[in-house]
């Protein structure tokens, strides 16, 4: 007779609230301080996982702001140089792609690649879009909004990434 053995409900992972670390965005980075706190994992459960909210704040998640006057995207790309990044506007979308070939770091050899796609609001002036990379690795994509009723100018074009020598003024989460 086959019997399925399951962990008690209080020791099971909470599915979408605690996804597998396999899909976390920090493949080439070391452990965080809270990953090294053994008393948490042993006192709560052998299956304890750090809060997803905490790991989201520490990862390279982007921030999108859209107010009355402008549209801005902040994206942490600290492992990429401007030459590794491609920013394109196509119709109502901005596509940001980053890729660098295999290189050596503190933990061995690593290559990274990402692709992000964001919908632009219909009233963003696509002829005035800009993109810059700060000294601390924060990519800032921005564009002013036009008055309603004016043509925002939809076309496909590449946006050059300029390098800034100062750190980003984007808020850290």
From Swiss-Prot:
One of its GO terms (cellular component) is nucleus. Zn(2+) 3 binds at residue 154. It comes from the Eukaryota. The modification Deamidated asparagine is found at residues 101, 123. InterPro entries: A-crystallin/Hsp20_dom, Alpha-crystallin/HSP_16, Alpha-crystallin/sHSP_animal, Alpha-crystallin_N, HSP20-like_chaperone. The modification N6-acetyllysine is found at residues 70, 99. Zn(2+) 1 binds at residues 100, 102. GO terms for molecular function: metal ion binding; structural constituent of eye lens; unfolded protein binding. GO terms for biological process: lens development in camera-type eye; negative regulation of apoptotic process; protein refolding; response to heat. Contributes to the transparency and refractive index of the lens. Acts as a chaperone, preventing aggregation of various proteins under a wide range of stress conditions. Required for the correct formation of lens intermediate filaments as part of a complex composed of BFSP1, BFSP2 and CRYAA. This is Alpha-crystallin A chain. The gene is CRYAA.
């Amino acid at each position: 007779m086959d019997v399925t053995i399951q962990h008690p409900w209080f020791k099971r992972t909470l599915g979408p609230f605690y996804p597998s670390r396999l899909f976390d965005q920090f493949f080439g980075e070391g452990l965080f301080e809270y990953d090294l706190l053994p008393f948490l994992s042993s006192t709560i459960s052998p299956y304890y996982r750090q809060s997803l909210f905490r790991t989201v704040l520490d990862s390279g998640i982007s921030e999108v702001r859209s107010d009355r006057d402008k549209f801005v995207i902040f994206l942490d790309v600290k492992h990429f140089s401007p030459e590794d990044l491609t920013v394109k506007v196509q119709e109502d979308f901005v596509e940001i792609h980053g890729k660098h070939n295999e290189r050596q770091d503190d933990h061995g050899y690593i290559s990274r690649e990402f692709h992000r796609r964001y919908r632009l609001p219909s009233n963003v002036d696509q002829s005035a879009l800009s993109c810059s990379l700060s000294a601390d690795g924060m990519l800032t994509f921005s564009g002013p909004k036009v008055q309603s009723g004016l043509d925002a100018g939809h076309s496909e074009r590449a946006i050059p990434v300029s390098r800034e020598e100062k750190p980003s003024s984007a808020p850290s989460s």
